[in-house]
Curated annotation (Swiss-Prot):
Positions where Phosphoserine occurs in the chain: S227, S228, S230
Subunit structure: Interacts with pab1 binding protein ath1.
Keyword annotations from UniProtKB, A to Z: Phosphoprotein, Translation regulation
Function: Involved in post-transcriptional regulation of gene expression by 3'-UTR-mediated RNA regulation. Promotes interactions between mRNA and poly(A)-binding protein. Binds the 3' UTR of mRNAs, centromeric transcripts and antisense-rDNA. Required for the establishment but not the maintenance of heterochromatin at pericentromeres, and for the maintenance of small domains of facultative heterochromatin known as HOODs.
Effect of a null allele: Abnormal establishment of heterochromatin. Increased level of RNA-DNA hybrids.
Biological source species: Schizosaccharomyces pombe (strain 972 / ATCC 24843)
Record-stated family: Belongs to the XPG/RAD2 endonuclease family.
GO annotation terms (biological process): regulation of mRNA stability; regulation of translation
Protein name: Post-transcriptional regulator mkt1
Keyword Cell cycle: no
CC terms in the record's Gene Ontology section: cytosol; nucleus
Length: 802
């Protein structure tokens, strides 16, 4: 994101400065990771963007990042990536619903507190509706316009994972990365970094010199303004290894007498990453119009106040809230200081008492520290801080929700198409079940997070906003009796009790092997030693022998995760679902093990539905719906990654149902990752760990679910393959059918290389899946009808000669 139209002002006044990257040698460069990632995405071709969307991992993204890092390494520049932290989703304070003049007077009185030139604003600057009664209205959840969008979350996680592999330092800000970068540069007597690479929004945080774009050895130049024509990739060999930077003081000199605060006011009116465009401003050159307004009225506050009676009340109130947040974030953006304390970067006496209205409830500094080190992701913590979160159902509403509305008829047309009506009803039920399953994960994670905290957090209501719809919200119940921690605290795994196959991964700094975790529970000696010998350990009664190594911390957390997700009993034995999972993981490739866990979770929760039968009177291959079986195999294939060659080619095949399922399983996997992190936080916060022995980087490298592989392209390939061979009946042999299918696949998907190799990998993956299913038959985890359909699908596959 960037300040709207400021790029035109910069070009018009010729304020872009270019320098050689070599002039920045031996320096530390702070990088706004979300901005940098957005720049890369805007430079991608449509084909590259499509590849990024349909693959769990992007080789193009990794290649671009590795090239950038290599160029910095060549110039001896140390990069420090700073990521956005807790999402600024929040529950607004009371909005008075009063009629007529009282409502208008209340709004204006409230807004007057935001005049930055008023001498009486100090402590009560952000008091909401001070003139009204406290209980006049009820609070309503509202979503903040934030620059950390949902679609960037998965990519940011990939970048963190890749930076760890490259041993590159990164930092997660408490809230906004821009505020933290500004503190790193200007907030201390000895700056932590020498320069910032970020968007023009940094001007709002007092940064007056910063880098806006860089040309590395690939000759790829990316503009800081996505809306400008220069956003497209350009080749510029003359500007090789250079960077473009901006001088805010020079900009100020061309504003015809505006003060710095008035210039920032103008930027806020234009529209930024933290504020929308003021509705009264029109045209292309927004910054000039905004400057004229500020010059005319003296401040943005007075300009907005002047038009209060012109705007319809809903528009004015909405913009009013957005403006307040923007002022709050730019002036009091909370950062982590050099002492590890999380505070606004201004003197305490100038901080408003009710700043929590916009930043949410404050957490212990210890939690912010673990966030900064990348140990704890921020979505669940954001829900606790704000009191609400965006319901994951919005992911599905783009697909099945729209279909459901299209399939529902009203009035005279109602019932004319019962097939579509039934499909819409089924889609709505499936959607609700998926949300319920995700909210169970959120309830578990929030219970684990709040248990060691103050009772205020334990009793805090968390509202799930149904697809950002405030009128269809649900309360997420996160109270368990007893707390989940009490049920799982018996897991205290000490290094002296570990089998060699469990400890070896930590020596190699690789993710723990989930199969090894489960098979260790078949050893009675290990099971006996896995129990904590001390009773009722916790924050008030820490163990005498706390966990002191990364292996002990990670393994204890993993076993608690498996118990909470019903794969392990409180007796530390495998459940009826744990045994099938163990069997499936036995011959599974290491990189696919977390995907198999997600696969069995969805199978257990009936989110992965078995193929259907044409007739229920018998159970034979002839009764199997080939179309349904093909769709089922394609869904299973989305858990399998696929390697593609560097060249890109547009994928013409679009399957909305498969796309919907891929989004469902990736969303579910990311929520399991959040739960895994909450369990880790519970272990640490309950003083089960010697905190001086925590190694954040090694924990990140060895904790599972950090990078769940999968690919939508893999599902497309497998579905197309089985569609072809099931229809090709005229060839002289099955092998000719198969070879013909391989040739067609390689023409339709030219970047995947050998279709035969990928189908072989899928069949191996399917084989491991079916081994788990067969074990589920022995443990009675899966019903007989579902088992029969899965076995028929397996028979059909091998009847094709594969």
């Amino acid at each position: 994101m960037t300040i709207r139209s400021l790029n035109l002002f910069i070009i018009d006044k010729k304020h872009q400065h270019k320098s050689s990257l070599s002039s920045f040698q031996n320096c530390k460069l702070g990088i706004d990771a979300s901005f940098y990632l957005t720049q890369i995405i805007h430079s991608f071709t449509p084909q590259e963007l499509q590849s990024l969307a349909v693959n769990g991992e992007s080789e193009y993204l990794q290649h671009r990042i590795s090239e950038f890092l290599e160029q910095l390494r060549t110039e001896n520049i140390t990069p420090i990536f700073v990521f956005n932290g807790i999402p600024l989703t929040f529950e607004a304070s009371s909005q008075l619903e009063v009629p007529g003049k009282q409502k208008s007077h209340s709004a204006l009185t409230d807004f007057e507190a935001f005049d930055p030139y008023d001498a009486n604003i100090q402590r009560n600057m952000y008091r909401m509706d001070a003139s009204g009664p406290a209980n006049y209205g009820e609070s309503k959840p509202t979503l903040l316009y934030t620059n950390q969008r949902d679609h960037l979350d998965r990519l940011c996680d990939q970048v963190k994972f890749y930076l760890d592999q490259c041993n590159v330092e990164y930092f997660v800000a408490p809230y906004l990365a821009m505020a933290q970068l500004a503190y790193f540069l200007n907030g201390t007597s000895s700056p932590y970094i020498d320069a910032i690479y970020g968007s023009t929004d940094l001007l709002l945080f007092g940064v007056k010199k910063f880098i806006t774009s860089m040309n590395t050895s690939s000759n790829v130049k990316i503009s800081s303004d996505p809306s400008s024509p220069s956003t497209q990739t350009t080749i510029n060999s003359a500007a090789k290894s250079s960077f473009t930077w901006l001088d805010g003081n020079a900009l100020l000199q061309d504003t015809n007498g505006l003060s710095w605060q008035q210039f920032i006011d103008s930027c806020l009116l234009c529209g930024t990453a933290i504020s929308p465009t003021f509705p009264q401003i029109e045209g292309t050159f927004l910054i000039k119009s905004a400057m004229e307004l500020v010059r005319m009225f003296g401040s943005a506050y007075r300009a907005v106040l002047h038009f209060a009676e012109i705007f319809p009340q809903p528009i004015f109130q909405d913009y009013l809230q957005q403006y307040k947040r923007a002022v709050c974030f730019s002036k009091f953006g909370i950062v982590m200081d050099t002492k590890g304390l999380t505070l606004p970067p201004v003197p305490t006496e100038s901080v408003p008492n009710d700043i929590n209205i916009y930043f949410g409830t404050r957490l212990p500094n210890e939690i912010y520290f673990y966030i900064s080190r990348g140990l704890i992701p921020c979505k669940m913590i954001g829900a606790l801080v704000s009191g609400c979160f965006s319901d994951p159902v919005s992911i599905l509403e783009q697909h099945i929700g729209d279909k459901a509305s299209q399939g529902t008829f009203s009035g005279a047309n109602s019932g004319l198409n019962p097939g579509r009506d039934n499909a819409a009803a089924v889609a709505a039920v499936d959607q609700r079940r998926f949300v319920d399953d995700l909210e169970e994960i959120w309830s578990q994670g929030l219970n684990l997070l709040t248990q060691p905290l103050n009772r205020f957090y334990q009793a805090r209501d968390i509202v799930s906003l149904h697809g950002h719809n405030q009128q269809a919200s649900l309360k997420v119940m996160h109270s368990y009796d007893p707390p989940l921690y009490n049920d799982t605290r018996a897991w205290m795994i000490y290094e002296e009790n570990l089998p060699s196959y469990l400890s070896s991964n930590f020596l190699k700094e690789e993710p723990v092997v989930l199969f090894d975790l489960l098979r260790a529970l078949n050893d009675p000696v290990f099971v006996k030693k896995s129990f904590c010998t001390e009773g009722n350990i916790g924050i008030k009664n820490p163990p005498k022998h706390p966990l002191s190594s990364t292996a002990e911390i990670v393994l204890s957390s993993c076993y608690r995760f498996l118990q909470i997700r019903s794969f392990v009993l409180t007796s530390h034995q495998l459940t009826s679902w744990g045994c099938p999972l163990l069997k499936a993981l036995e011959n599974c490739h290491l990189q696919n093990q977390t995907s198999v866990v997600v696969l069995f979770e969805l199978l257990r929760l009936r989110q992965l539905k078995e193929p259907s039968l044409l007739s229920s009177s018998s159970a034979s291959i002839a009764d199997l719906s080939i179309t349904s079986a093909t769709e089922f195999l394609a869904k299973v294939a989305t858990f399998l990654p696929i390697k593609q060659r560097p060249e890109v080619s547009k994928i013409s095949i679009v399957d909305e149902n498969l796309l919907q399922f891929y989004q469902l399983q990736t969303s579910f996997g990311s929520n399991l990752k959040e739960l895994m992190a909450m369990i880790l936080a519970s272990v640490i916060l309950n003083r089960n760990v010697d905190k001086s022995k925590i190694d954040p980087k090694l924990i990140r490298k060895t904790l599972p679910f950090q990078n769940i592989n999968g690919s939508l392209v893999s599902g497309f390939v497998v579905k197309r393959f089985f569609e072809i061979i099931s229809k090709e009946q005229e060839a002289s042999s099955q092998q000719e059918n198969i070879q013909k299918a391989y040739e067609i696949i390689e023409k339709e998907f030219p970047t995947i290389g050998s279709a035969e190799n990928h189908i072989a990998q899928f069949l191996e993956f399917w084989k491991t899946f079916m081994e788990g299913v067969k074990e589920a038959e022995n443990t009675s985890a899966i019903g007989k009808l579902v088992l029969s359909k899965l076995f028929l699908t397996n028979q059909w596959i091998f009847s094709l000669g594969l």
